[in-house]
Curated annotation (Swiss-Prot):
<keyword id="KW-0717">Septation</keyword>
<feature type="binding site">
    <location>
        <begin position="159"/>
        <end position="162"/>
    </location>
    <ligand>
        <name>GTP</name>
    </ligand>
</feature>
<keyword id="KW-0342">GTP-binding</keyword>
<keyword id="KW-0131">Cell cycle</keyword>
<comment type="similarity">
    <text>Belongs to the TRAFAC class TrmE-Era-EngA-EngB-Septin-like GTPase superfamily. EngB GTPase family.</text>
</comment>
<dbReference type="GO" id="GO:0046872">
    <property type="term" value="F:metal ion binding"/>
</dbReference>
<keyword id="KW-0132">Cell division</keyword>
<dbReference type="GO" id="GO:0000917">
    <property type="term" value="P:division septum assembly"/>
</dbReference>
<dbReference type="Pfam" id="PF01926">
    <property type="entry name" value="MMR_HSR1"/>
</dbReference>
<protein>
    <recommendedName>
        <fullName>Probable GTP-binding protein EngB</fullName>
    </recommendedName>
</protein>
<feature type="binding site">
    <location>
        <begin position="193"/>
        <end position="200"/>
    </location>
    <ligand>
        <name>GTP</name>
    </ligand>
</feature>
<dbReference type="InterPro" id="IPR027417">
    <property type="entry name" value="P-loop_NTPase"/>
</dbReference>
<feature type="binding site">
    <location>
        <begin position="58"/>
        <end position="62"/>
    </location>
    <ligand>
        <name>GTP</name>
    </ligand>
</feature>
<feature type="binding site">
    <location>
        <begin position="92"/>
        <end position="95"/>
    </location>
    <ligand>
        <name>GTP</name>
    </ligand>
</feature>
<keyword id="KW-0479">Metal-binding</keyword>
<keyword id="KW-0547">Nucleotide-binding</keyword>
<dbReference type="InterPro" id="IPR006073">
    <property type="entry name" value="GTP-bd"/>
</dbReference>
Length: 235
């Protein structure tokens, strides 16, 4: 069973000042509205309604946190001592690229997203959700440029790959890797950006995505007291 299956709702925030005071690693999911972000989170966590998936773009307006490990979620928010039991946090960021919301709301969300991905020390990596049928949009590129200076990893899920034939899927993946590979640090070294095809409907790419997220969160090894022997991958 994947550790991600342990995910439970933790808290929701609308301002950076309200971000949880936890010190565990976080991995954030970002993407254009209706690119399949909430669906990807739900399928990875083996839950139908963990992340809210709306048919109305821009409906998800807050940063939603889901905890992995620890006691019952309700206790975490009331008893700070319980927070130490959490092993990691999954973060569902508001979708961007919406057209049916006010300009002031867009500005607030853009500032919230930019500040969070650039300044949150606990953020270990970003999972960027991109519809495989469409190239990287201007806002996808903006997210890359916000996050790249941190030097932290990005893993791109090219969703809805079941809608593409084999050649189109290969081209989409090649294009994504070319775009991601164009980002280099001051020494000319590429940033740790990776990409894969993904389909929630067909459950393809699920194991690859799960393993990558676990790796990025540093959860490859079980806590010492829970380890009863070598992991399946080690034998």
């Amino acid at each position: 069973m994947s550790l991600l299956w342990q995910a439970r709702f933790f808290t929701t925030v609308n301002h950076l000042r309200d971000l949880p005071k936890t010190q565990v690693p976080e991995i954030a999911f970002a993407g254009r509205s209706n690119a399949g972000k909430s669906t990807a989170i739900n399928i990875l966590c083996n839950q139908k309604k963990l992340a809210f998936a709306s048919k109305t773009p821009g409906r998800t307006q807050h940063i939603n946190y889901f905890s992995i490990g620890g006691a019952h979620v309700g206790q975490h928010r009331k008893d700070e001592t319980k927070v130490d039991e959490i092993r990691a946090l999954l973060v569902d960021l508001p979708g961007y690229g919406y057209a049916e919301v006010s300009g002031s709301a867009k500005l607030h969300w853009q500032e919230l997203l930019g500040d969070y991905v650039q300044r949150r020390e606990q953020l270990a990596a970003l999972v960027l959700i991109v519809d495989s049928r469409r190239p990287f949009t201007e806002l996808d590129i903006q997210m890359l440029e916000w996050f790249a200076p941190t030097g932290k990893p990005i893993h791109c899920l090219l969703t809805k790959s079941d809608k593409l034939n084999r050649n189109d899927a290969a081209n989409a993946l090649r294009t994504a890797r070319t775009i991601l590979g164009s980002y280099v640090d001051e020494n000319g070294q590429p940033f740790p950006f990776t990409a894969q095809m993904f389909s929630a409907l067909k459950r393809s790419g699920l194991d690859e995505a799960n393993d990558k997220i676990i790796e990025l969160l540093g959860l490859n090894e079980a806590p010492q007291e829970e380890s009863n022997g070598p992991a399946a991958n080690d034998v």
